[in-house]
Amino acid sequence: MNRKKLLRLGIVLYSLCIVCFCFTPQPQLPTGVETPGIQTIGRLVFLLTPFNSLWNLGEVTSPIQLFWIFLQNALNVLLLFPLIFQFLFLIPSLRKTKRVILLSFLLSLSIECTQLVLDFFFDFNRVFEIDDLWTNTLGGYLAWILYKLLHRTR
């Protein structure tokens, strides 16, 4: 299998992982773990405070809650990293900072909006988070930086 076919397969498989991770019903949080700053409209759930994890850090009541918040942010940074990294190898026209940031942001916004639609129709217990937009976009940007670093040494 040549490199382009392998990259395409990787993109398809990782996209399926994103679908499973982001668009399936989310279980309730473990007992004692709550996210500060949550707002609800009907069964739609929003976290619209930018940098919510930092602003509401004083409301964290346990080490488990603190770990959960850190883990959630770290996973959001990593969510689009592999996908964007593979796109960079496959699509030369994407290899500009503005394009990477725009694609990462639009993918993240699409994920968040799709979660809202799924919650509206099927009550999947998902949350539209402003912080997901910037953390996912940061992950795409970090993929771009790694790509540039790897190609600088060639």
Q: Residue spans of the language-model regions?
A:
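Bulky hydrophobic segments
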Residues: 1-125, 141-154
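Alpha-helical transmembrane segments of polytopic membrane proteins
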Residues: 72-74, 132-136
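Non-cytosolic membrane-interface motifs at loop->transmembrane helix junctions
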Residues: 124-133
